[in-house]
Amino acid sequence: MQRKHKRILFVAVSFIALGCVSAFVLFELSKSISFFCTPTELVADPIKSSRYPIRVGGMIVKGSIVRHGDSVTFSITDLGTELEVTYRGVLPPMFGEDVGAIAKGRFVDGVFIAEELLAKHDEKYMPKKYSSSDAAVIGSS
């Protein structure tokens, strides 16, 4: 083979290999995509949850937490719409009423089935080991 043909073949094989690697990386990354929406957005467009798991966030509604053995059912709200969530697993330590929560899962027949659950805290969070006087000192620095 002539030098010119070898160079063309090398470039062509390189582009094909690069394309295959790029396609593989994009395919693998698409598995980890999870979109975020509010309960109002999810109820308005339930198709969002059909292809990929999504994250939905809001405040846990007072009086909505019901435990069933190792699973829990509760409602979250964005102050517009309430969404029923079912979760099976270990609850986060800060989980409770009037606490922000983010659930990752799928929306099936009007109920959000969560695979992961995170409890949020506000930016003023202080660990219990600090007293209120320590918090004042830390907050002023």
Swiss-Prot record:
Residues 1-7 are cytoplasmic. Keywords: Cell inner membrane, Cell membrane, Cytochrome c-type biogenesis, Heme, Iron, Membrane, Metal-binding, Signal-anchor, Transmembrane, Transmembrane helix. One of its GO terms (molecular function) is metal ion binding. Its main location: membrane. The keyword Metal-binding applies. GO terms for cellular component: plasma membrane. One of its GO terms (biological process) is cytochrome complex assembly. It holds the Pfam family CcmE. Heme binds at residues 121, 125. InterPro entries: CcmE, CcmE-like_sf, NA-bd_OB-fold. It is found in: Cell inner membrane. Belongs to the CcmE/CycJ family. This is Cytochrome c-type biogenesis protein CcmE. The gene is ccmE.
